[in-house]
Amino acid sequence: MIFPIWKKCLIQLQIKLSPVEFSLWILPLKVTIKNNIIYIYTPNLFIFRWIKKKYVNIFKKILYKICSNNPPKIIINIEKKKLEKKKCIYKKKNIQIYLHSEINKKYQFHNFIQGQSNQLAYYSSYKFTKNLKNFYNPLFLYGNTGLGKTHLLHAIGNKFLIKNKKKKVIYIHSENFIQNMVNSLKNNSIDKFKNYYRSIDVLLLDDIQFFSNKKKSQEELFNTFNTLFNKQQKIVLTADCYPEYISGITEQLKSRFKWGLTISINPPELKTRIKILLHKAYENKILLSYEVAKYIAKKIFSNVRELEGILKKIQILSILNKEKITINLVKKILNKIKKKKKNINIIYIQKIVAKYFNIRISDMISQKRSQSIVHPRQIAMTLAKKLTHYSFSEIGTAFGKKDHTTVLYAYKKINQLKKKKTEIYSDFIYLFNQLNA
């Protein structure tokens, strides 16, 4: 729901700010109004600090113009759910350390949009829940970001729980599995950790590539895998590429990943993209005609997540501009969004970053380790991951045949700098905004 006062404020902000600023900092905010107080909720701490520093005074000035007689007070908080999760992660003793194990009920088989690109993955996932003892185990799904791997993991979990609510069905992202193990070692509770994960009925482990070059974590995963497999418990794994091509993973683990059935999920074809858009429009009560959905689907083709993001932008801007969603409106919006982004590929990103830092592309893709080269290289790798559909392995290849783990390390390092006000992260944000404008 968009409150009338906040809607007026958004219109003024849209005029005052650049499209990049508006979509990057304002659109993610959630707002409620009570007793003449506007409660603004940010999705994370970084945006919270940025809004307080850069935009609170702008909000106040606009609201004073809108309701000069009695302007509302503004209170900014981090969205409650996110805050609670963050607190839980750092609690130590006597607290359940195994987080992120809940299955998301939103993701079911019935609302997974099937098409030629994902039909085999869908069928295999559904068949996996039939609980046939001799059926393929593990099931390994791989493909680029935003194609539905996580949706299928949760759908599998939900199906098992519908059959038997007492089953111990655990969904967890690989990074959280690793973090839980580290916390257990720190808290001298590693036996508890082992007992927990080795007593699972169904393990749904997302983004297995995050185990890359983590020797102890891989040992624990190896032992957990063997225990569950020998007990004929179910295992489903996902990754961004075929098991054989995940660098930094032991051959023992790779061979086990391939013991069952390995299925790829590909980017959706045109018909599936249209179906996804119409389904998402129906779910979100957006009036979207088939012709408009087809037009969008022809322009956006990388993944489901991008389709959803574009649809949300179109919905918000149609509300703000009080216009129906027509092909002409969509053309205007897509032209703005895609003006620079349409030509974005890894080579283009390398050119822009090299020019910004006044270095040569040949240096960026070389083996040079000086800070003047390493930082631009890490920024360029992270931009490539965020702004293109390429996997870590493919990005590594484009940067002088570097290992998948080098790209993963760069990506994590740049993202960790969000918490610190560093010059490197400022450079990254500036370049991201320039490329994504």
Swiss-Prot record:
Per the record, which residues fall in region Domain III, AAA+ region?
102-318
Q: Where is this region: Domain IV, binds dsDNA?
A: 319-437
Pfam families attached to this UniProt entry: Bac_DnaA, Bac_DnaA_C, DnaA_N, Hda_lid
Q: Carries keyword Transferase?
A: no
Recorded hits in SMART domains, A to Z, give:
AAA, Bac_DnaA_C
SUPFAM superfamilies in the record? P-loop containing nucleoside triphosphate hydrolases, TrpR-like
Keyword annotations for this protein?
Answer: ATP-binding, Cytoplasm, DNA replication, DNA-binding, Lipid-binding, Nucleotide-binding
Q: What GO MF annotations does this protein's record show? A: ATP binding; ATP hydrolysis activity; DNA replication origin binding; lipid binding
Q: Which domain of life is it from?
A: Bacteria
Which portions of the sequence form the region Domain II? 82-101
Q: Where in the cell is it found?
A: Cytoplasm
Q: Which is a GO BP term held by this UniProt record?
A: regulation of DNA replication
Free-text note regarding domains:
Domain I is involved in oligomerization and binding regulators, domain II is flexibile and of varying length in different bacteria, domain III forms the AAA+ region, while domain IV binds dsDNA.
Q: What does this protein do?
A: Plays an essential role in the initiation and regulation of chromosomal replication. ATP-DnaA binds to the origin of replication (oriC) to initiate formation of the DNA replication initiation complex once per cell cycle. Binds the DnaA box (a 9 base pair repeat at the origin) and separates the double-stranded (ds)DNA. Forms a right-handed helical filament on oriC DNA; dsDNA binds to the exterior of the filament while single-stranded (ss)DNA is stabiized in the filament's interior.
**Name of the molecule in the record:** Chromosomal replication initiator protein DnaA
